[in-house]
From Swiss-Prot:
Binding site for heme: C379
E.C. designation(s): 1.14.15.14, 1.14.15.28
Keyword Secreted among UniProt keywords: no
Gene name as annotated: cyp124
Cofactor requirements of the protein: heme
Name the record gives this protein: Methyl-branched lipid omega-hydroxylase
Cytoplasm as UniProt keyword: no
Swiss-Prot/TrEMBL keywords: Fatty acid metabolism, Heme, Iron, Lipid metabolism, Metal-binding, Monooxygenase, NADP, Oxidoreductase
Stored SUPFAM superfamilies: Cytochrome P450
Annotated function: Primarily hydroxylates the omega-carbon of a number of methyl-branched lipids, including (2E,6E)-farnesol, phytanate, geranylgeraniol, 15-methylpalmitate and (2E,6E)-farnesyl diphosphate. Also catalyzes the sequential oxidation of the terminal methyl of cholest-4-en-3-one into (25R)-26-hydroxycholest-4-en-3-one (alcohol), (25R)-26-oxocholest-4-en-3-one (aldehyde), to finally yield the carboxylic acid (25R)-3-oxocholest-4-en-26-oate. Also able to sequentially oxidize cholesterol itself, not only cholest-4-en-3-one.
Organism (species): Mycobacterium tuberculosis (strain CDC 1551 / Oshkosh)
Length: 428
């Protein structure tokens, strides 16, 4: 099926280049501008030579960097930290920079809280993400995906398009906007806002802290206005659930609703977008895996989706803060220290995956930590993300089975999100 404009295929299972430890600098944006192969090689070196190491915080304009952090790179350690929130606390922040009052205004949601309050807040919306409820919206997901792929074909008679703007971006965005009750006319605004929030630091998206804070205020004000409307006009949507919920006998404040809203639309959009895009890139590089999946789509879909999430590792890391002194692998860390959990590294750990460099759509077992390491903060939207990924690839298989990337992706300059800004594709 080869299209002559496709990017170069690769030999599946090829390990990344060796990167000496002296060439690794997690605390520099220059390191995060390097391509994925170098990044993978760097983390392989860290797992082998310095599985726990200390790094300075990247300086971003407007953000308070604060102290450096201990980087956990081994799957077992990331898993352990995820399962012990009493020691590795999500409070006060999940990114390495310090939380400030102005940031907490918009990013103080349940993701930066611990139980019991975290669990009470999570329970408000968790019902909307159960397998049963997600199965109910299957038809809506499929309809959206079908229309997006059909439009992609209709709007591009030259059979050249950007996968991110035409499918991988709009699909999860439209679904989470539907669930939140956001009108279609506002979807593009939401898309822009989430891009700025998660793309801050990338010159193509936003490097002006004032713009970042303005966008945060805009999305917060939008959420508050939508919530105020729902206080009067009940809808069968997640925003109404937030407005009507009681936690510890109290309704959520407008500020709590706004930060909750930001979490759901940002998390519910960016991560799935990048998993789908990395998946198409991987199928382009390893076409034998695509042939294998297309020949038994339903049979392989469950393991294929998990492997795409492992391969993509859309969230690169999360930060925790130690509540007590602890020693891991002979490294002493003190109460109050920042600890970073590197999912991108845990998902390539040679001690956990026999062949971590092989993109294997039938991989089973697959103990990846792409949705977090389990425990209290396991990704709330995992069921929805799996459904969206599966349906997106099913529609590609049906409508443009030989879709292939034509250029290397434009990568997001970010330490936190494994993002792709554009991925040009073609089909016959």
């Amino acid at each position: 099926m080869g299209l002559n404009t496709a990017i170069a295929t690769r030999v599946n299972g090829t390990p990344p280049p060796e990167v000496p430890i002296a060439g690794i600098e997690l605390g520099s944006l220059d390191f995060w501008a390097l391509d994925d192969d170098v990044r993978d090689g760097a983390f392989a070196t860290l797992r082998r030579e310095a599985p726990i190491s200390f790094w300075p915080t990247i300086e971003l304009p407007g953000f308070v960097a604060g102290n450096g952090h201990w980087a956990l790179t081994k799957n077992d350690d990331v898993f352990y930290a995820s399962r012990h929130p009493d020691i590795f606390s999500s409070y006060p922040n999940i990114t390495i920079n310090d939380q400030t009052p102005e940031l907490a205004e918009y990013f103080g949601s349940m993701i930066v809280l611990d139980d019991p309050r975290h669990q009470r807040l999570r329970s408000i919306v968790s019902r909307a993400f159960t397998p049963k409820v997600v199965a109910r919206i299957e038809a809506a997901v499929r309809d959206r995906a079908h229309r997006l792929v059909s439009s992609m074909i209709a709007n591009n008679p030259d059979r050249q398009a950007d996968l991110v703007s035409e499918l991988a971006g709009p699909l999860p965005l439209q679904i989470i906007c539907d669930m939140m009750g956001i009108p279609k006319a506002d979807h593009q605004r939401i898309f822009h806002w989430t891009n700025v929030i998660l793309g801050f630091g990338d010159p193509d998206l936003a490097t002006d802290f004032d713009e970042f804070m303005q966008v945060s205020a805009d999305i917060g004000a939008y959420a508050t206005a939508l919530a105020e409307d729902r206080r009067v006009n009940h809808h069968d949507d997640l925003t109404s659930s937030l407005v009507e919920a009681e936690v510890d006998g109290e309704r959520l404040s407008s500020r709590e609703i706004a930060s909750f809203f930001i979490l759901l639309v940002v998390a519910g959009n960016e991560t799935t977008r990048n998993a789908i895009t990395h998946g198409v890139l991987a199928l382009s590089r390893y076409p034998e895996q695509r042939d294998r999946w297309w020949s038994d789509f339903d049979g392989l879909a469950p393991t294929a989706v998990e492997e795409i999430v492992r391969w993509a590792s859309p969230v690169v890391y999360m930060r925790r803060t130690l509540t007590q002194d602890i020693e891991l692998r002979g490294t002493k860390m003190a109460a109050g220290d920042k600890v970073s959990l590197w999912y991108c590294s845990a998902n390539r750990d040679e001690s956990k995956f026999a062949d971590p460099w092989t993109f294997d759509l039938a991989r089973n077992p697959n103990p990846h930590l792409g949705f977090g390491g389990g425990g209290a903060h396991f990704c709330l939207g995992a069921n929805l993300a799996r459904r969206e990924i599966r349906v997106a690839f099913d529609e590609l298989r049906r409508q443009m089975p030989d879709v292939v990337a034509t250029e290397e992706p434009a990568r997001l300059l970010s330490q936190f999100i494994h993002g792709i800004k554009t991925l040009p594709v073609t089909w016959s």
